Amino acid sequence: MSRLAWTDPAPLEVERPRLPWWVMLPRKLLLVASPVIAVLVVAMVLVFTARRVRRYPLFLIGTATLAALGVGHSWWAPVTLLTALGVVGGLWAWQYPDSFARTVVRQIRSEWRRAQVYAWRWRRVMLFTELTKRTGQGLHRVHYPHICRVCADGWRDRVSVKLLHGQCADTYATHADKLANSFGARSCRVRVDRPRRIWLDLVHTDPLVEPLAAPYLAEPGTGVDLARVCIGHTEIGRPWMLRLLDRHILVAGVSDAGKSSVMWAVLRALAPWIRCGLVQVFGIDPKGGMELGRAQRLFQKLVCSNGIEAVELLEHVATLTRQRAEVLRKLGTRKWSPASGQPFVLLIVDELADIIAYQPDNALRKRANVALQSILSQGRAPGVCVIGQIQDPRKQIIDFRHLFPIKIAMRLDEPEQVDMVLGEGVRKRGATAHEISEDTPGVAWVKLDGRRDPDRVRAFHSTDADLDELSAYVAAGHNQAPTLLLPTGKGAA
């Protein structure tokens, strides 16, 4: 281009300054309205101060108290107060470490994380991830989601966010990876709190990385709550309570994902009742008994194949289910209870697909499907629970996943399999079962029917020594079960 050629300068892009509307009022009107304006200004200052104190109560109240003591008395007053607080805090942390960490350490960490991470980056991150809304031109027309609360638990930060109009939880779930990277977290999960309010769980470390040792066996005769069977821990440190009463459980995962850890943890928790006959366990292990045969004495009957014996056992339990339902109906009882005089029946099927999908005999495969679906659809009220384990959760393999109210997804191969097991859209809400490490067998995501959000859990790990102890514990009992209703036929329908 010639040096003499003329180029138009870039247009000057400036924003016209916008003054408050009340500045434009006549001077006399301003003089008359000055008391009202003063009250409004004071109210705004008070609201601003109250919001800051609510966000950083420990820091602001503590700083104000120390400053007031220093000004009103002398330098030794705040020093004395700090020394006394340090001594009291040390004794508190020594005697009650969990309470101190939950009350003091969490509050300090939360205020620090909010000030150091989220207060500085929030608007920029919202702008760059396109989670803002515009109502016109200029910076003053940009609306940002509002941070309501920050709770730092150490391994994760929980950020409560007030949504803008026109936004929903899925809007943030779509940008979860961007939010995690922006705030320096490993992952971000989105949970719905209430209308226009969500929680962002920004995870920094994995609290379930260490295996969980199997608990001690309960004393013989100890009661068992079938509605709350402890089989591990959740991600937030609480016991993982699995409901067996009125439920069926589907466990899906690849090889070596730790599917059997769920089964053995359940049997270990039920050991006192298995020992005395209040719980009867039936098992099918198509792998020749390589897994369930390790503690064969726990089972009322164990079939180690996928042939005719396995199908007959399914039909046996299906007939038992119908007969028990008939007895309960005549007694005027809608649900099974230990007072009915009948044991709780637990059916465990390892490698479920070998029986309902991979069985080469079409007649046996059809009979197995009919019997199993009959148990799943009718067995909840009569006190029959099914735990099915499967590697391939595709619909072509098992098309009645909806009959399992509790679904557990352990490590899976593909992202699409997560939604197959747990339900549509669960992966967007953070249930990344396909990202579970191979070094953490027993870690899983569990989804209950009727609940929107899944939970991340880890089951107890049972060693060979634990299984030997469990088998000996059950065998040492009298195992005198109440009289079973004997099936009169083999059909399941």
Where are these regions (language model features)?
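Conserved AAA+ ATPase small/helical "lid" subdomain
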Residues: 433-467
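Conserved alpha-helical scaffold flanking the Walker A/P-loop in AAA+ ATPase domains
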Residues: 333-339
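N-proximal, solvent-exposed amphipathic alpha-helical segments enriched in charged/polar residues
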Residues: 100-143
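Phosphate-binding P-loop/Walker A region and its immediate neighborhood
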Residues: 119, 132-139, 154, 164-278, ...
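Short, hydrophobic beta-strand segments
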Residues: 152-163, 354-358
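P-loop NTPase catalytic phosphate-binding loop
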Residues: 3-109, 218-330, 342-419, 426-430, ...
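Short edge beta-strands and adjacent turn/loop segments
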Residues: 135-158, 344
